[in-house]
């Protein structure tokens, strides 16, 4: 809707929405939006799209068949998901203190949300006749980040992804742990 609105502010609004979605709380500032509701103006602060959905394709209630006919989509569409993370978190000892326990709990919660979103998107693509393709960091990558936004770690991760793409990455066609035999 934003892109099709014809508004001269549409491009900047899309950029702001994407910036807000990537604004990790406490790491990046929230993005302020001026909004109007029932004739009254408000300021809204938006942060981290992952707080509501880690991965998103389209609303689950969308009638893809009807939409694809309207858009005259030819052939079977492809969805490509690139997950910047390892699926399985390794066991980790945690200090018996509130903050470390809370941080590990949040990490576990995020991992569950990512997997749940991958399953939801997979099931939607199967229902709607769309090819599902997933890439993620292999478990063989065992480097550890020493701090948030660790440049050395990010360079190693980039080099791994570059080499995997160069070698001809084989996309996963189902989410990790999904039993296609139990449909």
Model-derived segments and spans:
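Patatin-like phospholipase
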Residues: 1-183
């Amino acid at each position: 809707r934003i892109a099709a609105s014809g508004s001269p502010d549409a491009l900047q609004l899309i950029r702001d929405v994407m910036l807000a979605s990537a604004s990790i709380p406490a790491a990046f500032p929230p993005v302020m939006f001026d909004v109007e509701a029932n004739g009254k103006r408000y300021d809204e602060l938006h942060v981290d799209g992952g707080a509501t959905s880690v991965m998103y394709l389209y609303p689950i209630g969308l009638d893809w068949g009807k939409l694809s006919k309207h858009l005259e989509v030819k052939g079977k569409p492809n969805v490509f998901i690139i997950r910047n993370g390892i699926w399985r978190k390794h066991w980790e000892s945690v200090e018996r203190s509130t903050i470390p326990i809370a941080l590990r709990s949040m990490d576990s919660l995020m991992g569950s949300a990512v997997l749940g979103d991958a399953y939801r998107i997979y099931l939607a693509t199967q229902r709607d006749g769309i090819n599902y393709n997933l890439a993620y960091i292999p478990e063989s990558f065992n480097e550890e980040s020493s701090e948030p936004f660790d440049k050395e770690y990010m360079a190693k991760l980039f080099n791994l992804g570059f080499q995997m793409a160069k070698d001809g990455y084989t996309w996963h066609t189902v989410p990790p742990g999904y039993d296609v035999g139990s449909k």
